[in-house]
Amino acid sequence: MALEFNKTSYLKIYTGEDILFEDIPLYKAILREARSLGLAGGTVIKGIEGYASKVRGVGRAVSTFISGNANFPVIVELVDKKENLEKILPFLEKNATHALVVMGEADYLVTD
């Protein structure tokens, strides 16, 4: 039996765990908004290290060993049809400060 892949779109939002929307982390606000819009799925991935050409975040943590806190990179991945993902773009444009937003297409296969 040949595997059959389908087409989908994804939206990735790169930000930091210290970036807030109102009083909650931005990544939680994005997931909450995506859920309220009925998007197919979302995942938050916490990185252990990263860099960008521009400094993001309010206070840059030098090291967890020295300062006791950390500012780890966070990636929010949303998957759905492109027209559905576009519903969250106004929210991101208004509220996703210090973020990089990437949209693309992918092939997917769901396994049991």
Short names for language-model regions:
Residues 1-112:
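Positively charged, small/polar-rich N-terminal and surface patches that mediate targeting and assembly
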